[in-house]
């Protein structure tokens, strides 16, 4: 599991490095007061009160590889019941990941009131965003925006 997480983190870091200057983001940031968790990356935004204050936008890479592979295998097998089961499991996993990001890293006014979940493979990202109700629920309930390598 750590290898998967590391891969997504490396890919996300490379993308941020291409798009932002080093002053515009930080790696391994503690975004919640009195917390022990560190978000992989946080984009630095100016604070309301003072330009020296920083508000962080948490960005966390997630890679639901096993669940997504089960979903793909079900489609390849053409098993309708297995497709339905693995589809539900994929949604459950994405929801848990979104809740995890929100609970660990979102803490206004020190952070934005939302965070970004980065999915490191375009096929996983495409599968998630085609589920409009899921994306809307993630945004409404957990204030999580899903992104992928090309977004």
Language model features with spans:
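Amphipathic, heptad-repeat alpha-helical coiled-coil/stalk segments that mediate oligomerization
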Residues: 1-151
């Amino acid at each position: 599991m750590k290898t998967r997480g590391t891969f997504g983190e490396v890919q996300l870091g490379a993308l941020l490095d291409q798009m932002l200057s080093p002053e515009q983001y930080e790696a391994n940031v503690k975004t919640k007061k009195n917390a022990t968790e560190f978000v992989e990356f946080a984009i630095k935004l100016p604070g309301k009160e003072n330009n020296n204050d920083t508000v962080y936008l948490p960005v966390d890479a997630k890679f639901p590889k096993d669940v997504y592979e089960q979903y793909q295998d079900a489609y390849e097998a053409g098993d309708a019941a297995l497709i339905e089961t693995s589809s539900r499991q994929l949604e459950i996993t994405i929801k848990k990941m979104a809740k995890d990001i929100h609970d660990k890293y979102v803490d206004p006014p020190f952070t934005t009131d939302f965070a970004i979940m980065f999915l490191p493979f375009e096929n996983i990202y495409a599968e998630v965003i085609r589920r409009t109700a899921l994306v809307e629920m993630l945004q409404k309930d957990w204030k999580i925006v899903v992104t992928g390598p090309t977004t």
